[in-house]
Amino acid sequence: MEYTNMMELNFLSKSQNESFARTVVAAFAAQLDPTIEEIADIKTAVSEAVTNCIIHGYENKIGIITIKAFISGNKITIEVIDEGKGIEDIEKAMQPLFTTRLEEERAGMGFTVMQTFMDELEVESTPGKGTLVRMTKYIGSDK
C-alpha cells in the first residue's frame, strides 16, 4: 500500500479507550480537510470496530488493540486489529442483526454501521488468532 502519511496506535482493550481511539484517528484524518460529517462517519466506524474488539474479540478480557491509519491522496484507510478469538463465519457476522450476544441485548449492527459510514470495508479473521477490520473513506467527492 502506497501512502503519504501513516500512524499506528496500540492500546488496551478497555472500553474507556474507545473514545480515545476515535479521537486520535479523527485528528489524523483532519489533515485531509474533511467535512464535519466525514469526521463523524470516521469516528463512528472506528468506535464500532474498537467496540467489536473489546466485546467480541477479547470477550471483555484485556488484550492489545492496534489501529493503523494510512493516507493516500484523498483516501484514509484505517485498520483495527485484535489478537482475540477471531470470527468463525465472517459472512454471517456481517449480516445485519446477527449477534453472538443475545443475552446482552447486543444489536448486531456493528459491521452494518461500519459499511454505512465508510466507503469500503474488508474483514480478515482467523479463529483463535484475531481479526483485522480495514475501512476506507474517500474525503470529498472523488473516489
UniProtKB/Swiss-Prot annotation:
Annotated Gene3D superfamilies: Histidine kinase-like ATPase, C-terminal domain
Keyword field: ATP-binding, Kinase, Nucleotide-binding, Serine/threonine-protein kinase, Sporulation, Transferase
| GO MF annotation terms | ATP binding; protein serine kinase activity; protein serine/threonine kinase activity; sigma factor antagonist activity
Give the record's GO biological process terms: asexual sporulation; negative regulation of sporulation resulting in formation of a cellular spore; sporulation resulting in formation of a cellular spore
> Does the keyword field hold Kinase?
yes
- SMART domains xref list: HATPase_c
Q: Which reaction does it catalyse?
A: L-seryl-[protein] + ATP = O-phospho-L-seryl-[protein] + ADP + H(+); L-threonyl-[protein] + ATP = O-phospho-L-threonyl-[protein] + ADP + H(+)
**Catalytic EC class:** transferase
Its Enzyme Commission number(s) read 2.7.11.1
Which InterPro entries does the record cross-reference, listed alphabetically? Anti-sigma-factor_SerPK, Anti-sigma_F, HATPase_C_sf
Q: What is the annotated role of this protein in its UniProt record?
A: Binds to sigma F and blocks its ability to form an RNA polymerase holoenzyme (E-sigma F). Phosphorylates SpoIIAA on a serine residue. This phosphorylation may enable SpoIIAA to act as an anti-anti-sigma factor that counteracts SpoIIAB and thus releases sigma F from inhibition.
Q: Which PANTHER family match?
A: ANTI-SIGMA-F FACTOR RSBW (PTHR35526:SF3), ANTI-SIGMA-F FACTOR RSBW-RELATED (PTHR35526)
The UniProt family comment states: Belongs to the anti-sigma-factor family.
NCBIfam families membership: spIIAB (TIGR01925)
Please give the name of this protein. Answer: Anti-sigma F factor
Task: Name the lineage.
Answer: Bacteria, Bacillati, Bacillota, Clostridia, Thermoanaerobacterales
